[in-house]
C-alpha cells in the first residue's frame, strides 16, 4: 500500500504577473534584455478538413507505410521543387488520425522554421495539413562551399554578449559531431550543459532566407535557441525559449488550493495501471522508496542548484508519504509535504493526459516508454521551493527524449510566504506547457509556440486546463474563476479579468489582441474563448465531476467537460507550427470532426464567435479583424 499526502490545487500560469505589474517579457529573468522583440514571426498556413484536398493523396487503410507515403505524396505535390526530410516523430493518435512531420532543407541544411505537418484520417486520406515552407529563391551554395560564414564560437560569444547570458566563454573550442555542421562548444562555465551550435537556414520576417548559427544555451532560467547571422555573427534574427513561464497525504485531485478545504486527504495507491503500469514509484528497472518514478522525480532545490539527482527528497521504505503541513508554518518546515504534493499533482495530471491521448507515441514525459513508441528518458524534473526566483513558476520543454524541468517557487504576497505547489492550478498550468509544446509541430520540435499568438495560446491552454479540472459539482455557466488567487491572496487573481461567460465581467474578444504584446495577456483572451466552448459543451452533454472521463464505444468522452479537454488536446496535434488564433480554432473544429463526426460544430462556433473569432475573423500582423458570425447552417435546429 502506497500513500501520498497532497494538496490538489490547480490554477496558475508561468511567469505570472499581478494586474499592477509591468507586462512580463518572453522570459523576464534576462535583466535589461526584452526577448519579446526577438520572437519568430509566424508564416504558417493551415488547410482544414472543410477545404478541398487533392483526391490523388488518398490511400486505403491506415498502416504506417500507407499514411507516411500519403503524406510524402502531398508534400511533393504541394511543393514539387522543394527539398525536405521526413522527421521520425510520426504516429497515429488515439482518435485515429495519423500525424506526419517534415522539415524543409536547402543544400542539405534544415530550414529551421520550414515545417510541414500532414494529418491523415482513419480512411487513409489527408484530413488536414499545415505548412510554413519557404517559397522564394534558393540562395547559391557558394556561401557553403567557400565556407563564407563565421565559426560557431563567434556566434556563441555574440549571443552571450547581446543577450547578457550568465555564461563565461574564455578559451572555447568547437567540437565536431557526427553532423558536419553541428558542434558542441567546450570550455564555457555557467551553463547547465555545454552550449551547442548548428548551421541552419531561417526564414526572416520579410520572407528572405538567411544562413544562421542556431546556438543552444541552457542557463536554467532560460533555455534558448538563438539564431545568429552566420555571415557576420553580429545580428540575431530570432530567439526561442524552451521555458514557458503509495500513501500520500495531499490536497486531492480537483482541490485547487488550501483555501477550499480544511484538511488534506490520505490517498492509497492513487495511480491507474492503464496510464502508469509501472506505478508512480518504478521505472521498470528499479522500485524507488522516494518521490521518484517513471513519470517524474521531485526534490527540493532551495539553493538553486543546476543538478537534481542528489538533492533532498523524502524517503519512506513503506512508501508512506504523510507529512505535516502546519498552517502558517515556514516553508522549510513542511518541505516534505511540499515535495510530496508536487509529485502527486504532476503524476495525477500525467495519468489524466494519458487517458486523453497524450501517450508515449505523442511524446509524453516518461523515463521508460516500455516499447510503446516515442523516446525514453524524459520524465519531468520537479523542483519544489526552487531558489532561483520568487512569485512565479516555469517549465522547460526540450524535444522528446530529453527531460522536462518544472520549477516551483515561493510566493511572498503573504507572511509567511505561500508555496506554489499547493495551488495545483499552477502545477497544471506549467505541465500544460509541456503538453502543448510536444503536440504542436510534433514531439521532436519544441519551437512551434514561439510567435506571439501561438505563445499566447500556450499560456491560455494552461489556464483552461487548470480551470476545467477544478470545476465543482455545483458550478454552472454563471460561475467565474480567477487564476493564482491563493498564492497572491487576491480574490481577483492575477489575470486582467476573471474567466466568465459574462461579457460584462470579462469583455475580452479577438480584437483585444490588437492592444496586447505579451503572451500572458493574449493567453487570457484564448482561455476566455475556450471557457465559452467548455460551457457550451457541458450544457449539451452534461458534466462528469469524477477524476477520469468515461468513453463511448468510439472513444468519445461522454460528458462535455472531458470532451472539451479532449478536442482541445487533439487539436494541438493537428494545427501547424506556430498557429494563429484562427488556425487553432479551425484545428479544434477539425478535432471534433475527427472524433465525433462534427456533432459539436454549433457549440464550438458559438463559443468562438461570441468573443469575435467567428467565421469572418482575420489575422494580420498587428491588426486583427473580428467577426461574430456563425457559418450558415451550422446551428440549424433539427425538426
From Swiss-Prot:
Keywords: Glycoprotein, Hydrolase, Metal-binding, Metalloprotease, Protease, Secreted, Signal, Zinc, Zymogen. Secreted metalloproteinase that allows assimilation of proteinaceous substrates. Binds 1 zinc ion per subunit. It comes from the Eukaryota. One of its GO terms (molecular function) is zinc ion binding. Belongs to the peptidase M36 family. SUPFAM superfamilies: Metalloproteases ('zincins'), catalytic domain. The gene is mep. The active site is at residue 430. Residues 17-245 form a propeptide. This is Extracellular metalloproteinase mep. Its cofactor is Zn(2+). Its EC number is 3.4.24.-. PROSITE patterns: ZINC_PROTEASE. Residues 1-16 form the signal peptide. Zn(2+) binds at residues 429, 433. Pfam families: FTP (PF07504), Peptidase_M36 (PF02128). InterPro entries: FTP_domain, Fungal_virulence_M36, Peptidase_M36, Peptidase_M4/M1_CTD_sf. Glycans are attached at residues 287, 320, 336, 368, 509.
Amino acid at each position: 500500500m502506497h500513500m501520498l499526502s497532497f494538496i490538489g490545487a490547480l490554477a496558475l500560469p508561468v511567469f505570472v504577473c499581478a494586474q499592477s505589474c509591468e507586462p512580463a517579457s518572453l522570459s523576464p529573468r534576462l535583466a535589461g534584455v526584452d526577448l519579446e522583440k526577438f520572437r519568430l514571426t509566424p508564416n504558417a498556413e493551415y488547410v482544414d478538413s472543410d477545404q478541398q484536398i487533392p483526391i490523388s493523396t488518398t490511400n486505403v487503410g491506415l498502416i504506417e507505410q500507407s499514411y507516411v507515403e500519403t503524406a510524402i505524396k502531398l508534400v511533393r505535390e504541394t511543393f514539387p521543387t522543394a527539398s525536405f526530410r521526413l522527421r521520425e516523430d510520426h504516429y497515429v493518435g488515439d482518435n485515429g488520425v495519423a500525424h506526419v512531420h517534415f522539415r524543409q532543407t536547402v543544400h542539405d541544411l534544415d530550414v529551421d522554421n520550414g515545417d510541414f505537418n500532414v494529418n491523415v484520417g482513419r480512411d487513409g486520406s489527408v484530413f488536414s495539413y499545415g505548412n510554413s515552407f519557404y517559397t522564394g529563391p534558393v540562395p547559391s551554395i557558394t556561401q557553403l562551399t567557400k565556407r563564407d560564414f563565421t565559426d560557431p564560437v563567434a556566434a556563441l560569444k555574440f549571443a552571450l554578449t547581446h543577450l547578457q547570458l550568465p555564461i563565461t566563454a574564455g578559451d572555447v573550442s568547437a567540437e565536431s559531431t557526427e553532423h558536419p555542421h553541428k558542434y558542441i562548444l567546450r570550455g564555457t562555465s555557467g551553463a547547465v550543459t555545454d552550449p551547442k551550435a548548428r548551421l541552419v537556414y531561417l526564414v526572416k520576417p520579410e520572407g528572405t532566407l538567411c544562413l544562421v548559427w542556431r546556438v543552444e544555451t541552457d542557463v536554467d532560467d532560460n533555455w534558448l535557441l538563438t539564431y545568429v547571422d552566420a555571415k557576420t555573427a553580429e545580428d540575431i534574427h530570432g530567439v526561442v525559449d524552451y521555458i514557458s513561464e503509495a500513501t500520500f497525504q495531499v490536497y486531492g485531485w480537483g482541490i485547487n488550493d488550501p483555501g477550499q478545504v480544511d484538511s488534506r486527504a490520505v490517498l492509497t495507491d492513487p495511480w491507474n495501471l492503464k496510464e502508469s503500469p509501472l506505478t508512480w514509484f518504478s521505472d521498470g528497472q528499479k522500485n524507488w522508496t522516494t518521490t521518484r518514478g517513471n513519470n517524474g522525480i521531485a526534490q527540493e532545490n532551495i539553493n538553486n542548484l543546476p543538478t537534481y539527482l542528489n538533492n533532498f527528497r523524502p524517503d519512506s521504505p513503506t512508501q508512506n508519504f504523510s507529512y505535516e503541513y502546519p498552517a502558517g508554518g515556514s516553508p522549510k518546515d513542511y518541505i516534505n509535504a511540499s515535495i510530496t504534493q508536487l509529485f502527486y499533482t504532476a503524476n495525477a495530471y500525467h495519468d489524466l493526459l494519458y487517458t486523453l491521448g497524450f501517450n508515449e507515441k505523442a511524446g509524453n514525459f516518461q523515463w521508460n516508454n516500455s516499447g510503446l513508441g516515442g523516446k525514453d528518458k524524459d520524465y519531468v524534473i520537479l523542483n519544489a521551493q526552487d531558489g532561483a526566483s520568487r512569485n512565479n513558476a516555469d517549465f522547460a520543454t526540450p524535444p522528446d527524449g530529453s527531460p522536462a524541468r518544472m520549477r516551483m517557487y515561493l510566493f511572498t504576497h503573504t507572511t509567511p510566504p505561500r508555496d506554489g505547489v499547493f495551488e495545483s492550478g499552477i502545477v497544471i498550468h506549467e505541465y500544460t506547457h509541456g503538453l502543448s509544446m510536444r503536440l504542436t509541430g510534433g514531439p521532436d520540435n519544441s519551437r512551434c509556440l514561439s510567435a506571439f499568438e501561438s505563445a499566447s495560446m500556450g499560456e491560455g491552454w494552461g489556464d483552461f486546463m487548470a480551470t476545467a479540472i477544478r470545476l465543482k459539482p455545483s458550478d454552472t455557466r454563471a460561475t467565474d474563476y480567477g487564476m493564482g488567487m491563493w498564492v497572491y491572496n487576491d480574490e481577483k487573481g492575477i489575470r486582467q479579468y476573471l474567466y466568465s461567460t459574462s461579457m460584462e465581467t470579462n469583455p475580452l474578444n479577438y480584437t483585444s489582441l490588437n492592444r496586447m504584446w505579451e503572451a500572458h495577456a493574449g493567453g487570457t483572451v484564448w482561455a476566455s474563448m475556450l471557457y465559452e466552448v467548455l460551457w457550451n459543451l457541458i450544457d449539451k452533454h452534461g458534466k462528469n465531476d469524477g477524476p477520469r472521463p468515461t468513453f463511448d464505444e468510439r472513444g468519445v468522452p461522454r460528458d462535455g467537460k472531458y470532451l472539451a479537454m479532449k478536442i482541445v488536446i487533439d487539436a494541438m496535434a493537428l494545427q501547424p507550427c506556430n498557429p494563429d488564433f484562427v488556425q487553432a480554432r479551425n484545428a479544434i473544429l477539425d478535432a471534433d470532426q475527427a472524433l465525433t463526426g462534427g456533432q459539436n460544430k454549433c457549440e464550438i462556433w458559438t463559443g468562438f464567435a461570441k468573443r469575435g473569432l467567428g467565421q469572418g475573423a482575420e489575422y494580420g500582423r498587428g491588426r486583427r479583424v473580428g467577426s461574430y458570425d456563425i457559418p450558415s447552417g451550422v446551428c440549424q435546429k433539427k425538426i
